[in-house]
Every structure is written in structure tokens, then in C-alpha cells.
Amino acid sequence: NDTLVSSFENKEDANNIILGKSKMALEFMQGIQLALDSLEKTGVSINLVVYDTRNDSSKVVEILQSRLLDSVDIIIGPIYSKNMKLISDRYGNDKKHTLISPLSKSSEFLKNNSSTIQLNTPYKNQVKIITEFIEEKYNDQNITICYEEPEKGLALYMQKNLSKSQNKISMMNMIYTHIDSIRTQFLDTQIIILPSNNRAFVSKMLGTLGGIDSSFIVFGLSNIKNYDHLDLENLMHLDVHFPDPYYFNSNNSNNSKDKVLLNNFEEKFMAIPSRFSVVAYNIMMNFCTKNQIYEFEKFRLNGGKVNINAPLVKYQDYSLEKVLE
């Protein structure tokens, strides 16, 4: 289900948030509530209104027809792309509104909608982050880009972005991923890149690579973080790197703002914030104050903006840590 949460700031901004009626939604709301407390302490007053859309497109249409959103400045959501498109079709080019997609990986709603923003860094932007890091840190390495045919375009984009480096780039269309069929092909490879959002393919490749007696650095996309069935020790063994637009380490936060968030959340809810709570909190603080948590660039000439603040991370000592640049 989707829930539309409208918040109206008395003085300047107004905000709307669409979230799922689930554990994720409750965690998201906790982040909003914590942000409201923080904003109130700075003199910013916000009234919150919730609309339950039940993840029903007809309910979203009903809300749009009611004109309830006409007077707000910022609309955050929906989570689901089909409903996000309905909202962006109405307000996507309205300069009086800013539309924010908090979690969806789909960028379709950004096209020709200049007032839209995507927080989940698109895969092409993640490719740029990975290739820039490799070009800066590695030279004269053997790099293999492994892909399946449906995602060949993203693999070729990765190859193109690496073409200016001094590394040796190989492309490998993976038809078989059994360890015995590919073991010898990786003996001289130092870096392996998996530019894929296919859960089954990435999982199988990581399992196969973990069984090869060789030393790798593996780069993947942010979706790896969502695959909770992966072996953490294997991820550490393979030194798996990936961009994370939602990075927050509650175990070891050296960022003073993150520490404030963590301490305040624990005091209010007697728990550690989930990533959904952190996302919600950061959205409110970024767009209702002058704190710049995200960094944006244009998606296309006449389109919206995407978040490019997605630091590279890796698992180290059983914890997700930022990669030192």
C-alpha cells in the first residue's frame, strides 16, 4: 500500500510524502517525526496530513482530482513508479512544486519533468562513480566486465567510461557461471565489475567468484545491499565495492550530523534507525533547511534531477564502511 503524507510548513515550505503502509512506512514515519522535532526546535512549524492511497492508482487520481496538492511546495513520493508517474504528469513541470522520489530506482518520471528529483542514484550515474574511482586509484590492471545479454547496454556504457584509463578492459558475456567453466578465465584478472541489477545473476556470480582461488576486487551496483541472503564473509573476501545513495553506519558514525540523528532517534524511539528512517529524516532536513545532504545533477536537458551523492562502500569487519578515497 501507499500512503500520502502531506506536511505544510507555516512560514515557507510545504511537503508531501507518499509511503508504504508497512514496516517500511512506519520506519519512514519515525524519520519524519524525528525531523519534525528537530525542525520545531529551530522555529520551523509543520502540520502533517496523511492520505492513504492503498497503492491504488484510482485513489491517487482521486487525490489529484481533489486539488489537495495544489497548495503544497514539495511532494515526496510515491514509492511505486506507476503512482509516481501520475503525480509527475500533473505537477512535474509546475515550478511551484518540487516532486521527490525517495526510494524508486525508476527514472521514467524524470523525463520532460523539470520539477522532479530522484534520490535513488540511477545506475548510469553509479557507473560514473565506479569508473571515476577506478581511473583514479588503479592503473595497468586487468579488468573484466561480466554481464548478461539483457544488460549489455549498461556493460558497454561501463566499458566506454573506462576507455580512457590505462587498464586492460575485457568484456565477458556470461552464459555459464559454474565455477569449473570460468575458473581459468579469471586467473589474471584483478578487478571484476558486475554492472547488473539482476538479483539471480549477481548472487550466482558472487558465489562462483568466491570459490575461485584468486584475489579480486569486485565492483557492483547499489542493489547488492538489498540482497540479504548474500554471505557477508564472501562479500568481504571478494572486497565488493558499490555506490550507496543511502549510506548511514549506525555502528561507527564519524559524521557529527549522523551522530546527532542517531542519538536523538535512540532517545525518542529506544531503537537504532533503519535506512528508511534515515532517508525520511534526511529528506526533511535537506528540503526544509539549508542543510545540503544531497547533491544533484540534471538527468536530461528538459528533465528532472538525480542525486549523485552515492559514496562507494564495502563490507569490512562485518560492517558497511565508506571506501577511503
Model-identified regions with their sequence ranges:
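Extracytosolic ligand-binding ectodomains
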Residues: 1-325
